[in-house]
Amino acid sequence: STAEPSVSASPTLPAGSRVLTASDTRTGVNARVTVTPAKGWIRLAVKAQGIDPGEHCRLTAITRSGDRVAAGSWVVAAKPDPDAPPVSGSAVVAPDDLAAVEIATVAGKVLVTVRA
């Protein structure tokens, strides 16, 4: 018998979610950030490429007035895995007040800024 190809539907984003993308030619890093609103805060799901293996990174939400709110941190895997789940984060930033999401090293080097 012949197996039929399986078709999987793209996951549906929750209402009000936005997908933001950016690339930084200086660092070679590109990122895709899904922003999901909650009441008075946001959830972030980040897929980034071009960051050195083993790099310690932090995720920061930036408000329209320039306030910086920590949203998470992680260590980049030693071996890139395109099937790895996105890095998750959250920040107490009103969904409509988000201006950008920044990925930087813990030492402070900005790798990419994704504008909202």
Language-model-derived ranges and their functions:
Residues S1-A3:
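N-terminal, charged amphipathic alpha-helical interaction modules
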Residues P5-A116:
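Folded interaction domains in cell-surface recognition and envelope-stress signaling
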